[in-house]
Amino acid sequence: MLLGTGFEETEAIAPLDLLRRAGISVQTVGLNGSVIYGGHGIGVNADIEIGEMDLTALEMIILPGGLGGVASIRAYESAMNAVRFAWDNGKFVAAICAGPTVLADLGITAGKNATCYPGCEDGMGNAIIIPDSACIRDGNLITGTSAGCAVPFGLMLVEALKDKETADRIAQQIVIR
């Protein structure tokens, strides 16, 4: 999970929590150092910094939104290269809120069903925007709309990496209504 200064905290922490509840090993990757501050001033200790990332072990790369976080990802060539590597090697690529616009910059969303934060549609390139969807999976591409959709987005990531039964079990444990 790529974390750049100004990331949207809910869009990072909720999916991270759900993935770890599922027993999935997730590393948070700091782009601007080892402690990254989100858009609302919450500091997160990244597990590793971008230069330590092992792309060969990657199963999925996750981009939370937040305009500052998305700008940080775009500013780091190594982060953009990691996203491109994941996609080119058949790994899952997931992004929420403004994050999918980074994927569009790389041509990943072209011809794919996707969603994004309302108002970011112009930055989605040739994606097939599915309005009013919390999150969408199209093959190895997973996109989510906003912080308000962070839990369904996280459960979709669990389902992609594990299975529906695990995602359903976790949804039940956290009492999704």
Model-predicted regions and their roles:
Residues 14-21:
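Short, solvent-exposed amphipathic alpha-helices that sit
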Residues 29, 34-40:
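Membrane-interfacial amphipathic helices and adjacent loop/beta segments
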Residues 1-3, 7, 21-31, 48-49, ...:
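Active-site-adjacent pocket-lining segments in enzyme domains
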Residues 40-49:
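Short gly/ser/thr-rich secondary-structure transition/capping motifs
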Residues 11:
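Glycine-rich, flexible N-terminal cofactor/catalytic loop recognition
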